Amino acid sequence: MPRRTDKTSDFERWSEALLSPEWETRLNATEALGKMKDKRAVKSLLAALKDEDEYVREGAAWALGQIGDQSAVPALIAAVKDKDKYVREGAVTSLGDLANKRAIKPLIQALKSGDESMRRTAEKALLNLGEPVIEELLLLLKDSDWDIRWRAVHVLGATKNKKACEPLIARLGDENRYVREAAAIALGEIEDKSAVEPLIKALQDENKYVREEATTALAEIRDKRSVSPLIKALHDKDWGVRWGVANALGELEDPIAIDPLIKALDDEVRYVREGAASALQRIGKPAVKKLIENLQDPSANVRRWSAWTLGKIKDQRAAKYLINALQDKDSGVQFAAEVALTELEE
């Protein structure tokens, strides 16, 4: 008998396969029906959610999420309590795909009570629900488990909802550094100016990673109030923070930062020097005069990065000074000047 290949026949063939005595055949059927996204399969897949084989149940949970029929929500909520962890995770993932409000409390419970893998899965699912989940997440910010607070902060940041801003600002003072770090990231994602002063304060946090994320958040919010505190933070003892500060000052593009950034061209860490040079490039033409002057700086690093940056800005005023720099006693400066002159000609 010739194999049937039209869509209707494929659907019927795979629906029949769900009744096969072989678990692998039933599993393949759930995968095929999920890929078809045909709502006629929902009833059969709901039955497969109760299959004796855990792989088939997991496949059915996945397929129901792919099809996207809201009638599957109650059964998937029930499957969150399945005895097999992978079935539970599959159900949580599909509830996230369906983004139904009825799933909020089961997903919150999965976030709170699951192992690391389940918590991560529930976190991703909650991200899909958007604004309806915010109130529940705000409650989790005071949970006794720092990991729960951390995940709630992460999801709230991803929603970009300004309603979360004030509670997230409070988490900048959390006893756990991972939560403080996540709060800084989240506030940067939301980009609300009410977070500027608290983030400036976070530049003094005892943990370097919190300070670094505060620089990134301030860069995303782009408020001029942060320029002076960021300049001060260019002297932070941790190079990662200094690098973050340089990037932030580049985003803010304030000429006030030109001199401090030029000094940072002599930082002991190359990444910071590169960040400072890139920031000066972002500031652009207002930085040209100072960069030209610093082609005579005692530090070879400053001369080298000044030449490099002048090439990136492409201001013809720098040409004759770069030609002179070709005679610099440092070969690195000579090379940077040569490259910069080539860029000026482009």
For the regions a protein language model found, what residue spans apply to each?
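HEAT/HEAT-like alpha-solenoid repeats
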Residues: 12-19, 23, 43-50, 74-81, ...
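Structural detector for internal amphipathic alpha-helices that build alpha-solenoid repeat scaffolds
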Residues: 1-8, 24-38, 47, 54-70, ...
